[in-house]
Amino acid sequence: MLKAPRFWYQPRSLLGGILSPFSFLYQIIVRIRRGLYAVGLKKISKFPVPIVIVGNITVGGSGKTPFVIWLANELKNRGFRPGVVSRGYGGKANRFPQTVTENSDPLQVGDEAVLLMKKIDCPMVVCRDRGAAVKHLLRNFQCDVVIGDDGLQHYSLGRDLEIALLDDRHLGNGRCLPAGPLREPKSRLNTVDFVVPKQLRPNEIYQLKNPAKKIDFNELKELTVHAVAGIGNPGYFFKQLETLGANVIAHPFRDHYFYRSEDFNFDDDHLIILTEKDAIKCKQFDDERLFCFSVDAVVPDQFQNDFFRLISNIILRKQAQREGI
């Protein structure tokens, strides 16, 4: 079981200070790498449809998956034809790019990809090479906008809009790896189009074995539960359950962990509540104690207004360019 070092989220710490020189070196490398793309010394893949990148500048969960689900479905509801590309973290398929379906194996294409596909109404492709994923998507589907899931640092993929998400831990101690949780200097947020705070709303709790069997949120006030999370920020999940009144026995696992039945061999009969991403990998277990806690992203109205105005203008501009107007 792995989790982010505590000193990443402390303003001052001995270990953070010791690692600061390495963070400075890391920042230099990041700036040089990004600069090479900016001046054209490294190739950027460009496409005839808008590319919207959703990501963050911190290590760990920032609510990207629920947000991408919301964004893809909202685009579809407003008449767009979206598609999603992702790296497919944890997937071990021998062939990429690969189109994700509802029946895809999380072991092959990654847990997040399977969760996304079960909750969005649009095509999705996974590949380590994001540009190859977009090419495959556009070759096989009639998409007019592409969402890049967790691609903020993949500069080789051209983009028209960038959305950075921030979770409840914000930027931690403000330092880059390894002294802090930042993948890029915090000044990077000044270059993105939108910074959106993570906000998740509880949706429902249902049994994995029989999804029709649900637990009312009010029932949690009387329950002691095992909370199991193999996500980037398990603490947020545990706090959500505690806020709903549950007495939580926390079990954090490393991100993208693939569970075995013995991982749930607890010495009692308390219910076991999992995140949606974890539940995707546990449906094969014949265990009536396993329940899934599903959530929805809550997105600010101002962002929605600004984003859809911008994306509509970008689509019109790109159409005009293709038609030579």
Curated annotation (Swiss-Prot):
Record InterPro entries: LpxK, P-loop_NTPase
Coiled coil: none
Family per similarity comment: Belongs to the LpxK family.
GO cellular component: plasma membrane
Gene Ontology BP terms: lipid A biosynthetic process; lipopolysaccharide core region biosynthetic process
Alphabetized UniProt keyword annotations: ATP-binding, Kinase, Lipid A biosynthesis, Lipid biosynthesis, Lipid metabolism, Nucleotide-binding, Transferase
Matches recorded under SUPFAM superfamilies: P-loop containing nucleoside triphosphate hydrolases
PANTHER family: TETRAACYLDISACCHARIDE 4'-KINASE, TETRAACYLDISACCHARIDE 4'-KINASE, MITOCHONDRIAL-RELATED
EC number: 2.7.1.130
Annotated metabolic or biological route of this protein: Glycolipid biosynthesis; lipid IV(A) biosynthesis; lipid IV(A) from (3R)-3-hydroxytetradecanoyl-[acyl-carrier-protein] and UDP-N-acetyl-alpha-D-glucosamine: step 6/6
Matching Pfam families: LpxK (PF02606)
GO MF term list: ATP binding; tetraacyldisaccharide 4'-kinase activity
Physiological role: Transfers the gamma-phosphate of ATP to the 4'-position of a tetraacyldisaccharide 1-phosphate intermediate (termed DS-1-P) to form tetraacyldisaccharide 1,4'-bis-phosphate (lipid IVA).
CDD domains the record matches: SIMIBI (cd01983)
Name of the protein this chain belongs to: Tetraacyldisaccharide 4'-kinase
Residues involved in ATP binding: 58-65
Catalytic activity, as annotated: a lipid A disaccharide + ATP = a lipid IVA + ADP + H(+)
